[in-house]
């Protein structure tokens, strides 16, 4: 593959420094209007970046979103001995070139893992490629327990030896991972991806049953197969991987971010505006657009664009999160913000993560009427919200507070916005382009 002009070596001092004192100031009462492009999918890019460690060849990854989680993953790859070059930024992301022919590390410390839970994706590739990894327990958003037992049990089934000591997971394999049958007690997206990456270089065939079906898993399969892997079944609940001895160079474009796309459609709905999201795969957001229609939003789809036209006031609707193709848990906080000003009572049930109603406390500061118990929230819509100072508890919850601030009367200040930087590229610019008044201070 020819090297395009303009590529430069990414500096080791990657731009992922946490700035907890930064905040957003959002002016309420605006109707968003216009078009907005969708970035590459965060939840597809992260496992694909980890999968680049599986080959000594060159991995060219287009449409990688320039967000903090990707920056952290790039720095981890540097730490492990990979070389990463970053090209000019496009509308939806950048091109990254990765060469992992000189891996010289197997440890991922707490300074990285506390930043990002997705660092766990490195276990499968490193075990498959070099046979060893020592990794601190992953961090990320504080949205309740996300046990990594699915990952560990699956890797053990493939032949890995795993010990947990002093806050670290130490895993090794004597010679080569061995193909086997794995049944996941829950269709975990991360575990499915980790086991796929581990199994592509294993000896024999691996079958993953009750696998997650998310589009990001289909994208990972496409990336792996372009490297020379033999994976089939992604998008279904049974995935089969025939191990190969070596993988080669690859060029791949990351799919659009369905959560970002759905979030901008929700922004149109809550503000009574009209927003066209460009560069989306419409079927990836079907569960969200169906719910927005139920709430009174007009949805139009054509090609790779989706338009949402919000009503004067939304109607209440019940939401239950489920594994794909059900309603995504990463859109549940945003839907709570919409329900807070809808006409009627909405019942929101969270079945994926525990403790994902933290945004309810902050929405109540703005005048929302929300009662939570366990995994259920009852949201009685109010005619209007009032601007307030609120604290961002996690990535998607922070976006929910921005949506509420756009709808509220007056000015809303959102603190601890470093969470939001983990998942949205050029957020202020995109919202400003749609007519929002939002500033980072």
From Swiss-Prot:
Active site feature: 141
EC number in record: 2.5.1.7
InterPro entries hit by this protein: Enolpyruvate_Tfrase_dom, Enolpyruvate_Tfrase_sf, MurA_subfamily, RNA3'P_cycl/enolpyr_Trfase_a/b, UDP_GlcNAc_COvinyl_MurA
Gene Ontology biological-process annotations: cell division; cell wall organization; peptidoglycan biosynthetic process; regulation of cell shape; UDP-N-acetylgalactosamine biosynthetic process
Subcellular location: Cytoplasm
Protein name: UDP-N-acetylglucosamine 1-carboxyvinyltransferase 1
One function term, GO molecular function aspect: UDP-N-acetylglucosamine 1-carboxyvinyltransferase activity
Function, as annotated: Cell wall formation. Adds enolpyruvyl to UDP-N-acetylglucosamine.
Gene behind this protein: murA1
2-(S-cysteinyl)pyruvic acid O-phosphothioketal found at: 141
Family, as annotated: Belongs to the EPSP synthase family. MurA subfamily.
Enzyme class: transferase
Keywords, sorted A to Z: Cell cycle, Cell division, Cell shape, Cell wall biogenesis/degradation, Cytoplasm, Peptidoglycan synthesis, Pyruvate, Transferase
Source species: Symbiobacterium thermophilum (strain DSM 24528 / JCM 14929 / IAM 14863 / T)
Keyword Translocase listed: no
UniProt: phosphoenolpyruvate binding residues: 42-43
